[in-house]
């Protein structure tokens, strides 16, 4: 099972804990505001905003919160001005780490992320150092209990998806970013509810980690995930599923 989808599954299992800390809503509000700022406040003509609203509703965010986040993005309401950019670095064993950042204070965020890397066995890298190791893909994770392989394969192919992979307890659908919405809609129309879905950065190759290096990498991932300005963490580690599930527990 590939590292990025294993970690996505772990994050899904830990979602209730994250929600208690308010981090899910904070990140979704930032994403909605930036999407509205960059592409306008109409979700019908702004695919990124449409996806952010779908994600917010899936987490039971109140409609008023969504509306205010859109209005802050379009400038109809006052609020913080967010900047989005990527940060790159390395974990133990030369594992690549790519971060999606949304922040209202670049200097503060860069300093804090640099500290998180250094404290947890990693180090920051220059722009472009690891981003070339990843490519953008639509990534839809579905529990095997929710769909049979043949049925799901037919849906994926008809909707324009690229691949259907066996990831242990789950099926993983990969799409081109342009086909992501159509494939996700087709899956849901068939009555299948994904465990998670997003357009994400997927590594081209993976680095196997075991023992102390694996534990250090998990600590680094958790430290980065904890930061309020980090929207997403992408990495090319491959760590045993059992160890990751112990962390999720």
Where are these regions (language model features)?
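Positively charged, low-complexity, intrinsically disordered RNA-binding extensions
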Residues: 139-249
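N-terminal cationic and glycine-rich segments that engage phosphates or anionic surfaces
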Residues: 1-125, 130-139, 208, 249
């Amino acid at each position: 099972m590939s590292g990025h989808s294993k970690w996505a599954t772990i994050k899904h299992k830990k979602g209730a804990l994250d929600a208690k800390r308010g981090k899910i809503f904070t990140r979704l509000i930032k994403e909605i505001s930036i999407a509205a700022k960059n592409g306008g406040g109409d979700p019908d003509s702004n695919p990124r905003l449409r996806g952010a609203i779908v994600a917010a509703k899936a987490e039971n965010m109140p409609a008023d919160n969504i509306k205010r986040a859109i209005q802050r993005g379009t400038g109809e309401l006052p609020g913080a001005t967010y900047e989005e950019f990527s940060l790159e670095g390395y974990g133990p064993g030369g594992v690549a780490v790519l971060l999606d950042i949304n922040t209202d204070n670049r200097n503060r965020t860069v300093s804090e992320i640099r500290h998180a890397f250094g404290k947890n066995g990693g180090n920051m890298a220059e722009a472009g150092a690891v981003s070339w190791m990843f490519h953008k893909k639509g990534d839809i994770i579905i529990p095997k209990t929710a769909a049979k392989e043949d049925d799901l394969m037919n849906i994926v192919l008809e909707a324009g998806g690229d691949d259907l992979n066996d990831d242990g307890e789950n099926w993983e659908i990969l799409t081109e970013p342009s086909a992501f919405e159509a494939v996700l809609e087709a899956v849901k129309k068939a009555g299948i509810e994904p465990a998670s879905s997003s357009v994400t950065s997927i590594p081209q190759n993976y680095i196997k980690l075991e023992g102390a290096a694996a534990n250090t990498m998990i600590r680094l991932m958790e430290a980065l995930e904890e930061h309020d300005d980090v929207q997403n963490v992408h990495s090319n580690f491959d760590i045993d599923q059992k160890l990751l599930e112990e962390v999720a527990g």
